[in-house]
């Protein structure tokens, strides 16, 4: 199985990819479970194996971060990579072993698993929620629904904090038009596994039918949201105990700036924003320094 992270490259990680997630070792454990466990207990056994891999991966990240305490960007990317690896592996196991296709039915034709929100940005703290979109056709088959159910039970049994939705492309667009929170979460989408063509169609239609038509409205909404957030935090920049996430000049302000630029520029990467003149390279470098500090 090839992991399909669109953003996270091995040179962005704080520790070795192989040490963090040993797929060969996991496959061996899964094969042993298949041979020794009753089918009714197999899903639980898979969850236990992946839970151990998650614990070991987190310990490795913690150990490396203690050695490199200022490498915050690499650390949050590594937590995201670990979750990518676990989710992609779980999907592969579910759709080939627990819910193997019958006749010519191919699961990849009907489902794509997408990271959204903070997870979609590949920015995860140790206890961040894992926000997932199970993208399906308008009427998913019973088998696809069972795959999603098995996936969720495995992830829940691993004690991951899962936020999820199961939607078609049109449902995502319609909900994004009426709910700013959903719209922003969809702005930060990233392919994990499943049908890449379905994901690419989703990406194109979001940009054409949701983001492109509502840039001015989105900017106004975000600026109003920022003003209300500052007021709730007291409206002061200098405080004895600042809220580094929600306060004035905090992490959420930096994220809002990035969201607005990404939305207006119709850009997927910071390079596209720089090429279009929304940031200079120096401004973006300063942005990263501030972001990493927070």
Per-range role (PLM):
Residues 1-294:
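A nucleotide- and high-energy phosphate-metabolite-utilizing enzyme signature
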């Amino acid at each position: 199985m090839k992991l399909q992270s669109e953003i996270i490259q091995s040179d962005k990680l704080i520790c070795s990819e192989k040490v963090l997630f040993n797929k060969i070792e996991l496959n061996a454990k899964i094969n042993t479970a298949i041979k020794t466990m009753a089918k009714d207990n197999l899903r639980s056994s898979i969850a236990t194996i992946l839970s151990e891999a998650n614990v070991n991966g987190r310990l490795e990240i913690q150990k490396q971060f203690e050695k490199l305490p200022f490498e915050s960007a690499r650390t949050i990317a590594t937590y995201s990579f670990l979750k990518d690896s676990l989710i992609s592996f779980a999907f592969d196991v579910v759709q080939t072993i627990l819910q193997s296709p019958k006749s010519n039915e191919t699961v990849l034709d009907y489902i794509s698993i997408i990271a959204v929100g903070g997870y979609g940005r590949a920015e995860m703290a140790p206890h961040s929620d894992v926000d997932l979109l199970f993208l399906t056709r308008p009427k998913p088959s019973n088998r696809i629904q069972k795959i999603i159910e098995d996936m969720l039970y495995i992830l829940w049994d691993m004690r991951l904090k899962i936020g999820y939705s199961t939607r078609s492309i049109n449902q995502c667009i319609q909900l994004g038009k009426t709910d700013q929170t959903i719209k922003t979460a969809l702005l930060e989408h990233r392919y994990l596994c499943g049908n890449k063509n379905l994901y690419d169609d989703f990406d194109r239609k979001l940009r054409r039918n949701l983001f492109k038509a509502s840039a001015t409205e989105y900017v106004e909404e975000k600026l109003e949201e920022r003003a209300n957030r500052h007021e709730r935090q007291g409206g002061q920049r200098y405080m004895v105990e600042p809220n580094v996430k929600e306060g004035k000049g905090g992490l959420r302000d930096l994220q809002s700036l990035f969201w607005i630029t990404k939305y207006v520029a119709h850009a997927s990467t910071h390079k596209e924003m720089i090429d279009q003149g929304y940031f200079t390279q120096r401004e973006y470098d300063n942005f990263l320094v501030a972001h990493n500090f927070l």
